[in-house]
Each structure stands twice: as C-alpha cells, then as structure tokens.
Amino acid sequence: MSQTRHVPVMLQRCLDLLAPALQDPAHPEPVVVDCTLGLGGHSEALLASFPTARLIALDRDKEALRLSGERLAPYGDRATLVHAVYDELPEVLARLGIPKVQGVLFDLGVSSMQLDEADRGFAYAQDAPLDMRMDQSTGMGAAEVLNTYPPGELVRILRAYGEEKQAKRIVSAVVREREKEPFSNSARLVELIRDALPQAAKRTGGNPAKRTFQALRIEVNGELSVLERAIPAAVDSLDVGGRIAVLSYHSLEDRLVKQVFAAGAANTAPPGLPVVPERYQPRLKQLTRGAELPTEQEVAENRRAAPARLRGAQRIRAEER
C-alpha cells in the first residue's frame, strides 16, 4: 500500500482546533491522543507541528499499526502506538499511567488503506471477499452477517445504519439468493442490489450499494456502539482546557458527536436558581458552529474528504470531587 495516496482530511483545521491546548504554557509536554491512527497522516502532522507533544495512537487494525509504526519511527519514543479499539481509551491511558490528556482526535470511518486493499471487502467498486472487519483477527465478517442473520434483523440494520429506504426489498432478494448459495464476494451483492432496486432509487445518491455496504460495515465493527462509549470517554480524559476534534463521515456518526457535545455544553441546573452551582455548569465549550465542512478545493484534490464533518469542543470544567 503506497502511503502517497493517503491524504489526511481537513488536516490544517484539525491542527488549528487542537493547537491552543497543545501550546498551553501550563502543559509544556502535552499528551495528544489519535484515536484512529490509520496510516498516520494526522499523527505525523501532530508530532511535527507540536514538537514537545507526546502522541498516544490507537488502532484496531494491526496492519495499520505496522505501516504507521514505520512512518512515525523518526519520532522515537514521542509516539506510543497501541492495538486497541477507541472505546478502550480509559484502559489504555490507565495502563500508561496518564491521568489526563490535552488533546484528542478522531477520524472516523474507513481508512484509505482499508478501502484500497481489495481483499478487505470494504469497497463496492471492486470484487472482494465480503469481510469488512477492521480487526481481521476477531469477530464475524460481512458474509456471515448476510448469510446467517434473520431477515427482520437485516432490515433493521439496513434502515438504522444505512438509512436505506429500500431495505425490505434488498433483504428479500438477499434471503432468496442466500438459500441458493451463501454470499462470499462483494460483486454478487452489488449486482443483487442493483437488480432489486426500482429504477427511481438508482438515479440518486451514487452507487446503489453504498448504503448497504455502510450498514454492514457498521454492524460488523460495532462502530456506533463503540462510538457511543468512546466520545464521552474521550471528553472525560481531557484536562481542563483540553480540546477534542472529531471528523465523521455520515449523519449517524455526526449526530452522535453533536449530541455528546451539546449535552456537555448545556447548563443542567433546575430553572429558577439565583446562582448556578458548579456541578450544573457546562463541562464543554463548543468550538465549531455546527459541523464544519471541507473546502471545495480540498474535495477537488481528495474526493474522500467530500462527506467529512468536523466538530470540536473544549473542556472547561473539571469533575466534581
């Protein structure tokens, strides 16, 4: 896998959002966590831009850790790479003896490497085994989900995780076909979806298989349930003044991040209190007005940036003692 194809999304804006926390004189040796290391583009930029920072980088994909390890080797012991899912952040920090961090970055979704490696089965544009596991050493692949889940559960997944309006129609075709022969490769599924959808549904929203593949990937990797735990855990790990930046790539992820940040930025005091006790005051300050989008120029140069949505927040209050 050539690293030249890996272009970090909204890189400068992510660095700008995190910079005040990583250049704070109160923390001369700040700790920043890249929860989604991938090929290490954001991590490398963090290490280069903030020369006194220590980086903790997580990924569940062992191949990503190997490739990034080579890329980040020049930074020596400033970079600590950990094989972990990002909701394991509290355990990782505890193991490393790090009580609080100054910055956290999430770049959600599928890495360039996973999309570009045909045999991983993430991309619907090329035929490959239906796997889609980010950590190939554990769990159930996409083919097993398609071949074994009850029809009602498949419909739920396509609707909830793919926002697929034609879920019932697609699942009926899947069930009919899997009884003849179990699914193993992506091309057969793409063809089935194309045949199952009405003509009008094929005219909008790019490749007709896109939503189904997204739904299967989220189910296989437990992405939303992991994210539901990971974002609050990351906020908890932040020191006062620490900052978090999250890049998401579909509305389900972005909505979840939005809800966590909004809840953290809310005043939770009962109405009518003349003075608001500290425990009711906001823990977070939102740093972005809604979700920020990539520039037209960036999308023109890197089409994978097109669906990106960036949100940032700052920790402004410590935990109650």
UniProtKB/Swiss-Prot annotation:
Any one Pfam family match given in the protein's UniProt record, by short name: Methyltransf_5
The entry's keywords: Cytoplasm, Methyltransferase, rRNA processing, S-adenosyl-L-methionine, Transferase
GO molecular function: rRNA (cytosine-N4-)-methyltransferase activity
Region listing for Disordered, in residue ranges: 292-321
EC number(s) per entry: 2.1.1.199
First-level EC class: transferase
Entries under InterPro entries matching the protein: RsmH, SAM-dep_MeTrfase_MraW_recog, SAM-dependent_MTases_sf
Catalyzed reaction equations: cytidine(1402) in 16S rRNA + S-adenosyl-L-methionine = N(4)-methylcytidine(1402) in 16S rRNA + S-adenosyl-L-homocysteine + H(+)
Origin superkingdom: Bacteria
UniProt key word Zinc-finger: no
Recorded GO CC terms: cytoplasm
GO terms of biological process kind: rRNA base methylation
Binding site for S-adenosyl-L-methionine: G40, G41, H42, D59, L93, D107, Q114
Subcellular compartments: Cytoplasm
NCBIfam families cross-referenced by the UniProt entry: 16S rRNA (cytosine(1402)-N(4))-methyltransferase RsmH
Family: Belongs to the methyltransferase superfamily. RsmH family.
Family annotation (PANTHER family): 12S RRNA N4-METHYLCYTIDINE METHYLTRANSFERASE, S-ADENOSYL-METHYLTRANSFERASE MRAW
Function as written in the Swiss-Prot or TrEMBL entry: Specifically methylates the N4 position of cytidine in position 1402 (C1402) of 16S rRNA.
Name of the protein: Ribosomal RNA small subunit methyltransferase H
Species: Streptomyces griseus subsp. griseus (strain JCM 4626 / CBS 651.72 / NBRC 13350 / KCC S-0626 / ISP 5235)
Taxonomic lineage: Bacteria, Bacillati, Actinomycetota, Actinomycetes, Kitasatosporales
